[in-house]
Amino acid sequence: VKILLISKHSKYEWERKQLSLTHDELVSKYNKERANLDAIMEAHEKQLHVRTTFKRVFTDSKFCMMHELSDTITDYDMVMVLGGDNAFTYVSHYIKNIPVLGINSDPDRSTGHLLKWSATDDQSIFDLAEVIDFHHYGISKWTRLEATIDGKVISPATSEYFFGERMRKNMSRHILVYRDKEYEQKCSGILFTTGAGSTGWAHSSSNIPPWDPSDKYAGFVVTEPYMSECNGGELLPGEELTLYSLNDSEGYASSDSWEEFEFMRGSEAKIYIGSPLNIMIPKRV
């Protein structure tokens, strides 16, 4: 079995890299910001330990950091992602048909709604190796969203798309075409969410009840609407929802809060159910 093992950076690693700071400089910054230095360093050590243990147990796998990805992943039988939900959705943008397993690398600090295994200790990693060796897992097909803006395909969304103004203080405006009816809306933006994303942003903004990631439909919610006749609904397979932008400041769309696309006045977006994401569901040993 050819496995690609992908890991997130710890907060400490990422900020040293991005800010080009020495250890002492970053610690000084954390102290100035009243950050919990002990918790940050404990999480860093946990990430390093889990990463090292996975490399030692899965000796034949190829390893990379998530931000080293640049093209669609091919030539592997499965992908394993070490991190949290954000790392999982990031990597999912590079996956088409290959089964993927999200692994919570720090379950004490991360909920990991989208992750189907947890690295609670070293034994849990050995157990996962046994699960894979004996094929004790199934595949669940999670619904994903796809979209075009002005005819150009954008990245799929595992959790959600957002369309609106970049700045919260600016009103988002668009025309929503849903099931042959048009609605001109003023709001704080519109969210299109899958079952995988239904426990996150859309739930927090509108308290919608979550649904299973494998359910073959998506939902949408208009956030903070002003006198709107249509504040939400379902999107079924074969349906297509159209959005015409009336944003005149910094209108944009985002996919899983990772990738961004311009969505200014006059732009047209079409949103629909796309190809599913194949999720590995281990059977506990």
Regions found by a protein language model. Give the residues of each.
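Catalytic phosphate-donor-binding core of small-molecule kinases
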Residues: I3-H9, W14, H23-L26, M41-L69, ...
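Short, well-ordered alpha-helical microsegments
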Residues: A87-T89
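A short, gly/pro- and small-residue-rich
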Residues: S92-D106
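N-terminal glycine-rich "phosphate-gripper" loop used for MgATP/nucleotide binding
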Residues: V81-D85
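Structural motif
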Residues: D77-M78
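Conserved binding/recognition cores within well-folded domains
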Residues: T193-A196
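Short amphipathic alpha-helical segments
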Residues: K17-Q18, V91-Y94, H203-S206
